[in-house]
């Protein structure tokens, strides 16, 4: 069947004029005209992102994230599906009370039900009730879904698309049509896929967005199909990709290269299955690498902050290996790499980390060279250069310690102490002369007790403290003993404690070495220290002593 030749009158009824694109005011302000070469960013973190495992937002959370995205300059923020749950209805009510400076809030929904007029479809009416300037609806492109999921005819599916969009345009909404399974549908039946997209365009859709819903399309295929859509459609074309084969961002870039002017995605790549197009990658790729107008460079400098903020609100541990904004995105470990970066930064960096609000990090390990030590020490405020006589000693000591099981990549407090002691710039603030840890109680209740004896100059202190466990008891006893000499320790707290058993496959469980990493804070800063020993108490004590000594060194 030649769907492309079906007359416009068939979609809207005989004698009904095709709706014209509307210049809409009100409902959040004037719609901006699409600038030449502008690629608009459409964020769906609050809807599609929450379909990812472990991702959930309260109404208050959604409003906070939306406001952050608005400040960042995202062009559209999809708030949710008002027909699906009370939470999203409440979000849209609250969003309507706010003034949005840069973004337009979008409500999301589907085409009308089969054999029901759009004006009578409750879900479609709720999209109008949301009072957003933009409505995004999805419809079927793939005949498999039309016949087996919707269980309707190809003709009725096209009518559902056209009728819904026409109704929304009549109600003065900007309409973005998400062509679900657009790429798989086109590969299955190009003629029918194009007919659905043209139906959306003729009904007045401002955008037809090609969705790689299953996330399995290759960039070359995306490029080819996007180019065809651009040739066949006069409205704007967008792209919505999923990351099932790790190509969501690459596919979005391919679409933009072929003329797509809207990219949909989520912050940090949240989304169903393996996630959506990660906007923290796509945005700098489009703006900085491709040189396209999108989010301004001044705002992209806040991208790392935006990424961390959304993770924090979602209560998700940040992905340190995330491109551009991750903690290791600009981290250098290999000695030859660091030596080159020390001379010419871009010799091993694709971009200046500050353009996205990130920073360069130099890691120190058994792979380190002299340049690693120098740059890391300078980063920590220690005066040192390649000609410092003690540099060889420091490097040897680091490699020996790493061989014993120490890991200084995440324990910069202990590393700073090692370097300063090797340089002769640290004098012991105290000496631990003795300690004892014991546990008493029965099967139902027990108490850990730690006793320590410390010397500061010619004075000694001998204290006892109870704790929830041996490490907590030691921490309390040490700070109690030293507080009289160093009041600054009053604010120091142990905030995290991690244990890793080393070389357990080559030794019995009791003989294996234990590495302890401690996070401490004084309510202003955080620092990390490490200890290694076959005895977990000894390893913990090393890390605790380094933690206290590092804080006193800062004083």
PLM features per residue range, with description:
Residues 6-7, 11-12, 30-117, 361-370, ...:
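N-terminal capping/small domains of soluble enzymes
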Residues 35-39, 45, 284, 290-459, ...:
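A mid-to-C-terminal "edge-of-domain" accessory segment
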Residues 47, 82-84, 108-114, 140-142, ...:
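Active-site beta-loop-alpha junctions enriched in small/polar residues
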Residues 51-76, 94-100, 114-235, 253-258:
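Alpha/beta enzyme core
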Residues 210-212, 264-272, 284-296, 356-363, ...:
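Short beta-alpha connecting loops at secondary-structure transitions
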Residues 214-217, 224-342:
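Catalytic alpha/beta core domains of metabolic enzymes, predominantly
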Residues 486-521:
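Generic long, charged, amphipathic alpha-helical segments
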Residues 523-555:
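Mixed-charge, glycine-accented linear interaction segment located at domain edges/termini
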């Amino acid at each position: 069947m030649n769907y492309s030749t079906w007359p416009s009158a068939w979609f809207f009824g005989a004698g009904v004029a095709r709706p014209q694109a509307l210049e809409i005011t009100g409902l959040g302000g004037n719609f901006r005209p699409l600038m030449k070469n502008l690629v608009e960013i459409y964020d769906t973190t609050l809807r599609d992102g929450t379909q990812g495992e472990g991702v959930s937002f309260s109404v208050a959370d959604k409003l906070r994230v939306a406001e952050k995205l608005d400040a960042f300059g995202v062009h559209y923020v999809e708030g949710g599906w008002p027909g699906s749950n009370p939470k999203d209805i409440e979000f849209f009510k609250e969003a309507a009370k706010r003034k949005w400076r840069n973004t337009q809030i979008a409500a999301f929904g589907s085409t009308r039900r089969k054999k029901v007029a759009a004006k009578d479809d409750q879900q479609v009416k709720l999209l109008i009730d949301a009072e957003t300037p933009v409505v995004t609806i999805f419809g079927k492109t793939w005949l498999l879904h039309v016949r087996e999921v919707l269980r309707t005819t190809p003709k009725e599916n096209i009518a559902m698309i056209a009728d819904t969009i026409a109704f929304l345009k009549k109600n003065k909404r900007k309409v973005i049509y998400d062509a679900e399974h657009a790429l798989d549908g086109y590969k299955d039946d190009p003629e029918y896929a194009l007919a659905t997209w043209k139906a959306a365009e003729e009904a007045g859709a401002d955008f037809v967005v090609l969705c790689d819903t299953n996330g399995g399309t290759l960039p070359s295929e995306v490029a080819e199909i996007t180019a065809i859509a651009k040739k066949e459609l006069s409205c704007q074309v967008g792209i919505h990709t999923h990351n099932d084969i790790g190509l969501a961002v690459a596919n979005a870039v391919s679409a933009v290269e072929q003329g797509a002017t809207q990219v949909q995605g989520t912050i940090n790549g949240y989304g169903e299955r393996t996630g959506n197009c990660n906007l923290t990658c796509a945005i700098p790729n489009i703006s900085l690498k491709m040189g396209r107008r999108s989010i301004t460079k001044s705002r992209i400098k806040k991208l790392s902050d935006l990424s961390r903020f959304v993770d924090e609100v979602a209560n998700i541990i940040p992905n340190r290996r995330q491109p551009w904004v991750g903690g290791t995105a600009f981290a250098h470990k290999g000695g030859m790499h660091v030596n080159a970066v020390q001379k010419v930064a871009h010799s091993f960096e694709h971009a200046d980390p500050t353009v996205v609000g990130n920073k360069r990090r130099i890691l120190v390990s058994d792979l380190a060279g002299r340049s690693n030590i120098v740059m890391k020490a300078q980063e920590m405020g220690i005066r040192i250069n390649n000609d410092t006589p003690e540099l060889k000693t420091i490097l040897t000591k680091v490699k020996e310690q790493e061989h014993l099981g120490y890991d200084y990549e995440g324990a910069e407090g202990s590393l700073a102490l090692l370097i300063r002691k090797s340089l002769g710039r640290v004098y012991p603030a105290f000496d631990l002369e003795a300690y004892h840890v014991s546990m008493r109680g029965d099967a139902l209740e027990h108490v850990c007790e730690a006793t320590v004896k410390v010397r500061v100059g010619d004075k000694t202190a001998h204290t006892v403290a109870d704790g929830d466990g041996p490490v907590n008891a030691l921490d309390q006893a040490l700070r109690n003993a030293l507080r009289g000499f160093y009041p600054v320790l009053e604010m120091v707290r142990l905030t995290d404690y991690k244990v890793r058993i080393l070389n357990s496959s080559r030794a019995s469980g009791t003989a294996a070495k234990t590495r302890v990493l401690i996070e401490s804070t004084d309510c202003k800063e955080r620092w990390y220290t490490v200890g290694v020993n076959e005895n977990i108490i000894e390893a913990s004590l090393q890390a605790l002593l380094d933690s206290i000594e590092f804080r006193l060194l800062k004083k």
